[in-house]
C-alpha cells in the first residue's frame, strides 16, 4: 500500500472514531440518566425488589415506559407524561390492578338506558366543585380493581354534602367486601353499587372511619355488617344522557358525576390536558368534578383514585367535547336521602304576572311503589324566584301535562344562564325505594283545592338541586 493510501485509510479511521466516540458518550450518558431516574423512582415509592434479576427486569420495564411517555407526549401537545408511581409495571400488570373493569362496563353497554331529561339553556363557562368544598380528598385504591367503588362512593360523598349535610368520608370497603352484585377487586359498576346500597343495605352508606379501606394489596376481606356508623343514605340513582353538553349542564346544577372511562393511556400522565386519549373500551371508574369551557382547550376535571402522587395531585384533565376516553358513555349519580337543609325565605320578586290567586305545585313522596302509602307532600308557589340550598335560584312552572323547573346556575335572582328540565304531572313515578308524584293547582287561600291528598308542608326537593 502506498504512503498516500495508508494516510487516507488512517484519516478515515480517525473520522469514524470521531463519530463513534460522541455517540458512545451520549449513549453512556443516557444510560446513566436512566439509572439515576430509576434510583430516584425506587426511593420515592419505596421499591425494594427480591433479586438482582427482578431489579434488572423492572429497570427494563421502566425504560419502556419512559419511551411510552414520549409517545403520549408527542400525541398530546397540551399534556405532560413521564415517571409516575406505575413506571415499573408492565402495561398488563397496570391494567389488571388499576383499570380492569372492561368486562363489566362492556356488559353495562348492552342494557337499556333510561337517562334523565336535561335541557341545556346556558350552562356556566366553568364549574369546579372542589372550590365549593364539595369533594373529599383523593384516595388510593391500591393494587385492587375497586375503581368502581371509589367512583360511586365519591359521588355519594359529594351529593350528600350538596344536600346540606357535612362533607363525610364514606366507605369504599363496604362495597368491595359486601356488594356481591359486583366483583370486589376484580371490577364492578357504579350503577350496580347504587342499586345494591338501596336494595340490600337499606340505602345506608357507612363512614370510612367505621369501615376503613383494607383491600390495597388486592385482597378483599369478608363482609362485616355490625359495628359500622351510617354516614349517608341514598334512595336511588339516575343515569345521564350520552351527551357532554347535557352532562355538563347537569353537573353544574347537581354536582359531581360518576363516569366510566378508557384509562389505558393514563399510566404515564403527569399533567395538562389530554387531547388524544385512547378511546376504545371502558375500563375504569372515576368522578367528574368540573369543567372549563373558557380555557384555550376546554376540558373536564376528573378525580381519580391513584393517590395524589399521580397526575395533577390525583386529578386528570381531558379535552371536553370530543368524547375523549369515552367519558360520555356511562355517566350516573346517586340520589341522596335525608331531609336536607330548610331553605331560606325568599324575598325576591315574582317573575309571573301579578294576580289575586297565585299558583302552587305539590311534590308527593310515598314509601310504597304506587303513591298510596306513607305519602308526605311539599307545597311551594310556581312562577316565583325560589332560592335553592346550593346558593342559586329556580323558577317552577306548571304546564298542561308537565312540571318544568328552570335552575339559574350563577344567580340568586333568577337571571343569567340556566338549565331546564321537566317531569310528568299526575303520574306516579316509581323509584328504587318508594314513589313520587307531582300536582299543580291554584287557590286564593293558600291551599290547593284540587289536590286532596296533601298531608303537611315541607321544603321542596328539586330534581336538579334541592330548593
Curated annotation (Swiss-Prot):
Record's catalysed reaction(s): Broad endopeptidase specificity similar to that of cathepsin L
Signal peptide: 1-18
Low complexity compositional bias, start-end: 345-354
Role played: Hydrolyzes chromogenic peptides at the carboxyl Arg or Lys; requires at least one more amino acid, preferably Arg, Phe, Val or Leu, between the terminal Arg or Lys and the amino-blocking group. The cysteine protease may play an important role in the development and differentiation of the parasites at several stages of their life cycle.
Annotated effect of mutating residue 35 to A: In clone 1800-2
Protein name in UniProt: Cruzipain
Domain of life: Eukaryota
Effect upon mutating residue 56 to R: In clone 1800-2
GO molecular function: cysteine-type endopeptidase activity
Annotated glycosylation sites: 169, 292, 377
Mutagenesis / variant outcome for changing residue 427 to Q: In clone 1800-2
A Pfam family the protein falls into: Inhibitor_I29
Disordered as annotated region, ranges: 333-355
Family indicated by similarity: Belongs to the peptidase C1 family.
Cysteines joined through disulfide linkages: 144-185, 178-223, 277-325
InterPro entries, alphabetized: DUF3586 (IPR021981), Papain-like_cys_pep_sf (IPR038765), Pept_asp_AS (IPR025661), Pept_cys_AS (IPR000169), Pept_his_AS (IPR025660), Peptidase_C1A (IPR013128), Peptidase_C1A_C (IPR000668), Peptidase_C1A_papain-like (IPR039417)
Site description Cleavage, residues in chain: 337-338
Additional remark text: Purified cruzipain is able to degrade itself, yielding a complex mixture of small peptides, and a major 25 kDa fragment.
